[in-house]
């Protein structure tokens, strides 16, 4: 066939409604808003082309490969209900386009340059179906939910955490003391804030030492295993690994990483180190809202959550449904299931566009954090279930009597909710009564109930289905 130079419409090559998807294809659902005058077939085909083999003009070297084997294909287009000129375009990518075990490479293709494409007004990646053949090239979470419970010897209830505040400005000694008070009071974990790395007021090594002391002292007093998420995030990968190694030498159970600001390559390396060395890995999602909060452009958090499960992390922040940070109930529970379960059915009412089989890749524990306090405990226990970490920062440290009583209040509230649930009571209907009953025999809980009885963060959720 002679080479024919010139520009041709994308849809002639990349829009293939007759295509039957393969079990090995990576499938993507994009929300596409074309520029006025651009037909949806052309827009969908352009997305498939620009995120796979295509470029803006026919090139001579196209003849040296098999486009049919390597091209992305837009195989289905649906109008978005209630929106004019907006479509869900489904694209199938052959597996050969992606390097094994690399979330970085997968994202560079699928959510790379195509998002700056001029023929589109906006583009959002709503969901990805990762084929089992590709899932199997990833280690995934260092340990997963069951192994974590076995390591910590904690079963049958959510775990409790607390982010140490003020997030910046404490000395290492005072920071360690705050950790100790929380852990002694009954929490399972305390947490470095995501922006605590190694600053002039508190260098990382000092913090690690004082927090390790807090862990060992509180473990000795309570007879429970305790942890503090030591943030290993750093300016270079070498420095990050140095911090992880030091944490392992201290014998602590868990470290933490900011996976979006730190990057997927660094995260995957750290996850491999954590599995090899018995460390749990807590993941913070700082920067996610830059990517996922706009409805029409960017990437939905469920995609970032899937990517994290592949790259590796044992915990990840996932919104609260009830606190100060974003999260609409059905949608949040949709990606919480994607993190924890082995098999998730397609369910558009929860924003899940594809059935996903994780073929026994370990699960990730979702972390509910942000503006939550004791009055939220029944709702959180009901919504998130046992396999979750409930994190109360201000909701622990803001207690009028101090950190340890704040921790006691949270632990009593949690134990009361778990017991009530196990006795068959309805947490949604009786939640406030359950907390009030428990506060009768816990002065710490009674004081917490009094402080936060009126606090609500009532705003309309941005992340709705449509």
UniProtKB/Swiss-Prot annotation:
Mg(2+) binds at residues 191, 193-194. Keywords: Calvin cycle, Carbon dioxide fixation, Chloroplast, Disulfide bond, Lyase, Magnesium, Metal-binding, Methylation, Monooxygenase, Oxidoreductase, Photorespiration, Photosynthesis, Plastid. The active site is at 165 (proton acceptor), 284 (proton acceptor). It is found in: Plastid, Chloroplast. One of its GO terms (cellular component) is chloroplast. Its EC number is 4.1.1.39. Pfam families: RuBisCO_large, RuBisCO_large_N. GO terms for molecular function: magnesium ion binding; monooxygenase activity; ribulose-bisphosphate carboxylase activity. Its cofactor is Mg(2+). The record marks 324 as: Transition state stabilizer. It catalyses: 2 (2R)-3-phosphoglycerate + 2 H(+) = D-ribulose 1,5-bisphosphate + CO2 + H2O; D-ribulose 1,5-bisphosphate + O2 = 2-phosphoglycolate + (2R)-3-phosphoglycerate + 2 H(+). Binds 1 Mg(2+) ion per subunit. The disulfide bond which can form in the large chain dimeric partners within the hexadecamer appears to be associated with oxidative stress and protein turnover. SUPFAM superfamilies: RuBisCo, C-terminal domain (SSF51649), RuBisCO, large subunit, small (N-terminal) domain (SSF54966). Heterohexadecamer of 8 large chains and 8 small chains; disulfide-linked. The disulfide link is formed within the large subunit homodimers. The basic functional RuBisCO is composed of a large chain homodimer in a 'head-to-tail' conformation. In form I RuBisCO this homodimer is arranged in a barrel-like tetramer with the small subunits forming a tetrameric 'cap' on each end of the 'barrel'. HAMAP family: RuBisCO_L_type1. RuBisCO catalyzes two reactions: the carboxylation of D-ribulose 1,5-bisphosphate, the primary event in carbon dioxide fixation, as well as the oxidative fragmentation of the pentose substrate in the photorespiration process. Both reactions occur simultaneously and in competition at the same active site. This is Ribulose bisphosphate carboxylase large chain. It comes from Barleria prionitis (Porcupine flower). The gene is rbcL.
């Amino acid at each position: 066939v002679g080479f024919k130079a010139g520009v041709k419409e994308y849809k002639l090559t990349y829009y293939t409604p007759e295509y039957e998807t393969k079990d090995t294809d990576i499938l993507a659902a994009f929300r596409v808003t074309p520029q006025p005058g651009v037909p949806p077939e052309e827009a969908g085909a352009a997305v498939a082309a620009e995120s796979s083999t295509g470029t803006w003009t026919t090139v001579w070297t196209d003849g040296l490969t098999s486009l049919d084997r390597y091209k992305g294909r837009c195989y289905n287009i649906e109008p978005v209900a209630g929106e004019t000129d907006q479509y869900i375009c489904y694209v199938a990518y052959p597996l050969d386009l992606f390097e094994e075990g690399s979330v970085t490479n997968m994202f560079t293709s699928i959510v790379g340059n195509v998002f700056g494409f001029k023929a589109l007004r906006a583009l959002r990646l709503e969901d990805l179906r990762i084929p089992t053949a590709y899932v199997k090239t990833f280690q995934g979470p260092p340990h997963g939910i069951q192994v974590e419970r076995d390591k910590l010897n904690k079963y049958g209830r959510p775990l409790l955490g607390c982010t140490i505040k003020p997030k910046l400005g404490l000395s290492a000694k005072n920071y360690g003391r705050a950790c100790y008070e929380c852990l002694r009071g009954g929490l399972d974990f305390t947490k470095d804030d995501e922006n605590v790395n190694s600053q002039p007021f508190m260098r990382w090594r000092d913090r690690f030492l004082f927090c390790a002391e807090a862990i060992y002292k509180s473990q000795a007093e309570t007879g429970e295993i305790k942890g503090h998420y030591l943030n290993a995030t750093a300016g270079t990968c070498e420095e990050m690994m140095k911090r992880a190694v030091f944490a392992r030498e201290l014998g602590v159970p868990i470290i933490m990483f900011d996976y979006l600001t730190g990057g997927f390559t660094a995260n995957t390396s750290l996850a491999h180190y954590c599995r090899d060395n018995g460390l749990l890995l807590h993941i913070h999602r700082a920067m996610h809202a830059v990517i996922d909060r706009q409805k029409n452009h960017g990437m939905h958090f469920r995609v970032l959550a899937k990517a994290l499960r592949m790259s590796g992390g044992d915990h990840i922040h996932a919104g609260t449904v009830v606190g100060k940070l974003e999260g609409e109930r059905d949608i949040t529970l949709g990606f919480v299931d994607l993190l924890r379960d082995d098999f998730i059915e397609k369910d558009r009412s929860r924003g899940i566009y594809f059935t996903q089989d994780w073929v026994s890749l370990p699960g990730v524990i979702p972390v509910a954090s942000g503006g939550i306090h004791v009055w939220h405990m029944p709702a959180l226990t009901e919504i998130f279930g046992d396999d979750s970490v409930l994190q109360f920062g201000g909701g622990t440290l803001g207690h009028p009597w101090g950190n340890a009583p704040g921790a006691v209040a949270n632990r009593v509230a949690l134990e009361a909710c778990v017991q009530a649930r196990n006795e068959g009571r309805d947490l949604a209907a009786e939640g406030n009564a359950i907390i009030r009953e428990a506060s009768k025999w816990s002065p710490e809980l009674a004081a917490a109930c009094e402080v936060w009885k009126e606090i609500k963060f009532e705003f309309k959720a941005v992340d709705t289905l449509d």
